[in-house]
């Protein structure tokens, strides 16, 4: 399944821990609605240190039932799909609502609204058929059919999935949408392939021999790069493939990747380069060092896209054992980004906590890679015990599995605020999206998972704590 991310405001009014997290420490459970939003917007449905994908999927089903408000669930799914671009989780919610909600007029329009691309129809049907089998509810068929009828020939051809287990034509035959020229051509087998850069590469891969395939792909990549036909994010995602299959265009590739104007107009953030960096480290490709240098430069250019935050900021990065792997990589790069872009202070914490100074001459990526991880446990209390000045906000980057000394640092946080006479806002990132909270006070927010909109939402919460909840509630859902 795809990855999901974002953050939510913390439930208020809790005065004592009321749940136990995966390591047995104290934590605070969100209300069912807030926990649902948290899980819907989290990126990590892949196996995590404490939870597997299957467990997370089951948790979603439980929360949908626990919330007991199908319209809220539907609004949250629409918000996740259209505001944050989350795909697989919206398919799951649509399938679950199709099974559990009967006789409601709004459901047909919801199923039509949840579809943003033609393959959303196929994924939603695939989920329902895999979990519940036939028959498919009429409201789901009618809603998805109405969505299919919106797409033109190019869109239908692009997502037809001719070689997939469940094809576009299978979806059309199942839901019987209103006939359109594009869908009629699809059913008759007369729809021409969409001409995209993906199909150009697919056509190159259909050559008869391995040698011809390699030559065709090299030519295809070369034409795409030299002709500047790839958007910046597509160039970033495919950098390693381009280097491997068309090394002769490495100069053009590096020039486009490091182009300051392209980076800034794409609004890409530093942490969005992480996958490209990790992919480039695989193998021993000629020219990889040059591309890595270009990525280093591009990451520094992308600091201009990071919003500023008024006042002082402390970034507290968890360096405990369970952070190893992707949470460590994304946490380090995000921490270095905030330090470089906003002048934030940096603290590492595990069994204890200490301030760390990054070399200002290092690039953002080099600075992130220089941050030492020392393993140990996760002592959230140490952050507030070691903080030596008043901060307007403290950003905590962790997998949220606090267990040292009971886990929840309620009293140390209160003592810190009293010591410096400050009302600090806490933004606590759960990099693995486990759905438990560490703090019960106002001005404290659990941010579950990750997304490329994280700075936008962080800024929104910093200005207006109830913004996200209101946004979900205000999503239009027609009867």
Model-derived features: positions:
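Short, conserved loop/turn and helix-capping segments at secondary-structure boundaries
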Residues: 328-332
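Long lumenal/extracellular ectodomains of secretory and single-pass membrane proteins
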Residues: 1-326, 342-479
């Amino acid at each position: 399944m795809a990855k999901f991310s974002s953050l939510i405001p913390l439930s208020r009014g809790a005065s004592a821990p009321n749940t136990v997290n995966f390591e047995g420490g104290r934590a605070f459970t969100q209300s069912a609605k807030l926990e649902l939003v948290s899980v819907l917007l989290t990126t990590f449905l892949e196996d995590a240190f404490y939870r597997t994908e299957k467990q997370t999927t089951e948790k979603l089903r439980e929360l949908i039932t626990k919330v007991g408000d199908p319209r809220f669930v539907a609004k949250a799914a629409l918000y996740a799909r259209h505001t944050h671009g989350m795909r697989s989780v919206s398919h799951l919610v649509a399938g679950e609502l199709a099974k559990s909600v009967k006789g409601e007029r709004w459901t047909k329009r919801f199923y039509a609204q949840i579809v943003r691309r033609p393959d959303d129809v196929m994924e939603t049907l695939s989920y329902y058929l895999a979990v519940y089998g036939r028959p498919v509810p009429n409201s789901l068929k009618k809603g998805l059919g109405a969505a299919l009828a919106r797409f033109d020939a190019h869109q239908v051809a692009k997502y037809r999935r001719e070689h997939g287990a469940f094809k576009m034509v299978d979806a059309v035959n199942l839901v019987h949408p209103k006939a359109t020229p594009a869908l009629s051509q699809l059913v008759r087998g007369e729809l021409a392939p969409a001409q995209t850069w993906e199909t150009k590469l697919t056509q190159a891969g259909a050559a008869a021999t391995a040698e011809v395939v390699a030559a065709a792909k090299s030519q295809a990549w070369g034409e795409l790069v030299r002709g500047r036909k790839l958007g910046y994010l597509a160039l970033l995602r495919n950098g390693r493939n381009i280097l491997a299959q068309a090394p002769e265009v490495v100069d053009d590739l590096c020039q486009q990747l490091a182009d300051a104007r392209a980076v800034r107009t794409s609004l890409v953030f530093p942490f969005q380069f992480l996958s490209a960096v990790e992919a480039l480290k695989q193998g021993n490709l000629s020219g990889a060092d040059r591309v890595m240098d270009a990525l280093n430069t591009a990451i520094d250019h992308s600091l201009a896209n990071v919003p500023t935050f008024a006042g002082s900021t402390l970034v507290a990065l968890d360096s405990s054992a369970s952070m190893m792997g992707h949470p460590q990589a994304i946490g380090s790069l995000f921490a270095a980004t905030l330090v470089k872009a906003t002048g934030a202070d940096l603290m590492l914490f595990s069994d204890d906590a200490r301030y760390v100074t990054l070399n200002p001459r290092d690039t953002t990526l080099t600075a992130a890679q220089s941050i030492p991880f020392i393993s140990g446990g996760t002592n959230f209390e140490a952050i507030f015990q070691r903080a030596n000045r008043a901060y307007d906000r403290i950003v905590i980057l962790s997998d949220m599995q606090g267990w040292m000394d009971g886990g929840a640092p309620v009293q140390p946080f209160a003592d810190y605020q009293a010591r410096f006479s400050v009302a600090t806002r806490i933004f606590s990132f759960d990099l693995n999206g486990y759905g438990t909270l560490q703090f019960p006070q106002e001005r404290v927010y659990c941010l579950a998972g990750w997304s490329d909109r994280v700075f936008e939402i962080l800024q929104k919460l910093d200005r207006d704590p109830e913004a996200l909840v209101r946004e979900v509630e205000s999503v239009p859902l027609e009867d």
